[in-house]
Every structure is written in C-alpha cells, then in structure tokens.
C-alpha cells in the first residue's frame, strides 16, 4: 500500500505543478526546432539497479524521441562538458528491497546551468515501464507546457492468416510504445471498430453473428465483456459521447443507413438522421454540442455537422473540395476535424476546421483511412493498406507532416487511442 501511495502522489501532485511551471514552446509553428535532450543514467550499485535504470532511461529516450519535439541523445556520463545547450535528464535507482526501488531523476539546463526539476518516487520493480512513461510525461509537461501521452494505450484490429489461410481478426490493445500487447478476443468471430471509453476502463466494439450486429463492451480491468445491445441489420462506427453516457452508431436496415444515439443506461435508441441518404461515421465535438458525420445527402459522400443546440438540427455541409469525404473525427481540443478524402483513385488523411475552412491534407497513399486523434490533438493515427495482405498503423503530426509506422506483430487496422 505504501508503494501505491507514493506512486499516486507522484502522478497527482507533481505533474500538474510542473505543467504550470513549463517553458512553453510554441508547437503550432512549423519553424520550431526540436529541443536537444540528453538522457543519462548514474552509476548503480547492484545488477538490478543497473538493469532497470537502463530500461527506464531507454523508455524515456524512446518516448521523447518519438513524439517529434526532441532530439534525444543517450549518454553513460552523469555530467559532460559536451552537452553545452542541451537539456539533461539523469536517472538513478536505489534498491530498497527485492521488489521495490526508489527512482530519482533530475532535469538540468546545461546552457543556463539551472536545475529545472528534481524528484524521486518509490515503485515496485515490476512497474519500471510505467515509471518510465510517467517520468516522460513530467518532462514533456515541464518543457512543452502540454500534458504528455506516454501512459496511454492503442487499440486496433489485429489480422493474420491461420493454418488454413483463413483471415482471423482479433481486438488488440497495447501501450502507446507498442509494448504489452494483449488480445481481447480469440478470433472465433468477426469483430470491428474498437473504441475506448472516455475513462479508459473499457473498449466497445462490433461483432456480427447469426444475422445480427452486437455492440459489446469489454472491461479492461477484469477482462469481462457484456452485450450492450443487439440489432437486426448492420451496425458500424460506434463512438462514445464525451460524457460516456451514450454511443453514436450507424445502423443499416431496410435500405436505409442512419445515425442513432444509444443510451447506455436505458439501452434506448434515438434516430438522429432520417431518410434514404447513407449517413455514417458520427463523431461528437468535445463539448457534445455538435456531431460531425459523412453522408451522401447531396449526391456524393461529404462531411456534415449537426448543431444540437439548434432546434431544427438540420445538417450543415462543411466539405466542398473535389472528391469524396469520409470518417470525420473531432479533435480532443475541438479545433479541427480529421477525415479521409478519396479523389482520383488516391486516398488522403486531412484536417479542416469545424466550419469546413482551412482544409489541409497531411498524408497520401494507395489506401489510407480510419483516422483517430492522439489525446494531445497534434497527431493522428491511421491505417495504411499497401495490398490486401499488408495493412499497418501510421502516425502523422499536424505541424511537420512527419510520418512513422507503429510497429505491430500482425496486420493492423481501425486504430483508436485512449484518452489521458
């Protein structure tokens, strides 16, 4: 219990404090250069201290390098004249018992010779990776002035061929750095579109069996699952409301495809769109006052927004570029909507303002789709399919449009990223 209290205090007290004291870097400007960062570890007394301090330093370095805002270097030295203008992170461990250690870390500005922060935390040895992520969050907060996302998770559809060359799909979840992959389903049924609940404690997904569509909620703590609702016809594109009390879904039945709201307490549904148009891919704004979706109301697939504060709730078209638009997703900051664009046989991932202005295309490919936001609102994860047997997850940032593949052991698609 003592270890747990130490860890909770570390998370709840120090991260907010360092955020307030941040050296705010304007990450919205494309001209911003990366921050030089040296990750160093101190001399250790025991083999366990040496092993875990190296592991933690590696996690910190990888996290901060991958976020695209730091130029990270590793050093075996605790101090060096060569660091000059770098910011330096030093990590040291002291073994308290066979199962507990105390981590001390120090953030130092080598240019001004000023100590930016120093802190320690006691933790169980088995939680070394989590500690690495938490320290990464603190450093990110202190230097960028923005909450880090290193202790979050990714869910996606993992797909591979069995011994009979039959495609097997499973719901997978892993840490944001690709570690600790778990499969939440066993591949005995078709599954699709996993989505995190706002509190991060569950994942909702769609399964199809016996001519019905099932909306299923998986509890990530005890690995149990429950059927939220079953529908005749095809249900797709589930999306939680920001308050976690309802789901938006697309429902196809009798030649119509409309968007429904499903109350998770009463299990009652309410039709939001009506008519013969195909309306799908709903997404709430963070304040839950608006909903973005795609529809062919105008004859071709475009993006629309409904204002729930307006009595008429009439859809307003926001996409007017050439081509078709699909899979809109509202950013966690509320300032942008990500989407998939299909034009002249090519696919694009792009963003626009909620009123449709300032459309920007971030990535182009043979088939790229299914964008989902990272909780920082600066990066997007999406699916890139190069061939029917090769689909992977990629990240793209809004400022520099840098892309990198997210490593997974199998084909991967339909990603979602957990909230803070």
Swiss-Prot record:
Query: What Pfam family is a match, any one?
Result: TolB_N
Residues in coiled coil: none
Protein location: Periplasm
- Keyword tags: Cell cycle, Cell division, Periplasm, Signal
Recorded superkingdom: Bacteria
GO BP term, example: protein import
The keyword Hydrolase belongs to this UniProt entry's keyword annotation: no
- Official protein name in the record: Tol-Pal system protein TolB
Question: What is the role of the protein in this entry?
Answer: Part of the Tol-Pal system, which plays a role in outer membrane invagination during cell division and is important for maintaining outer membrane integrity.
Q: Which family does it belong to?
A: Belongs to the TolB family.
What is its quaternary makeup? Answer: The Tol-Pal system is composed of five core proteins: the inner membrane proteins TolA, TolQ and TolR, the periplasmic protein TolB and the outer membrane protein Pal. They form a network linking the inner and outer membranes and the peptidoglycan layer.
Alphabetized InterPro entries for the sequence: 6-blade_b-propeller_TolB-like, PD40, Tol-Pal_TolB, TolB_N
Write the signal peptide boundaries. 1-21
Q: Gene encoding this chain?
A: tolB
Cite the HAMAP family for this sequence. Answer: TolB
Q: Which organism is it from?
A: Wolbachia pipientis wMel
